[in-house]
Amino acid sequence: NTWCGPCRASIKATEPLKATELKSENLVWLYIANETSPLVQYKTMIPGIQGKHFRLNEQQWRYLCDKFQIDGIPSYVLVKKDGTYELRNDLRDHDLLQKTLKEEIAR
């Protein structure tokens, strides 16, 4: 299968919010997988997940992990309208994720 259990659970929990409370032209959901995700399963799963999807090779994956200081998955990087970004693994808490994204949309 593709993506880890916690990643799939997070995707499942946030999917309904994309059509309701977190629906916004100013919010882009970006999903990144690496080559450990089997290609056939990956291509089968992504049509049901709203957002932009990228499957990276090892070099690209390492670059992003180094750039954003990612040491585990799922990881959340919040990129703000002004282009600044921060690693926000506290956003694994879906209530906090929802609150934070609503605040960012309102800015």
Region locations from a protein language model:
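Short, hydrophobic alpha-helical segments
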Residues: 104-106
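Short acidic-hydrophobic, aromatic-tinged amphipathic segments that line or gate anion-handling sites
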Residues: 53-57
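Active-site beta-to-alpha loop of glycosyltransferases that engages the nucleotide-sugar donor
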Residues: 1-5, 9
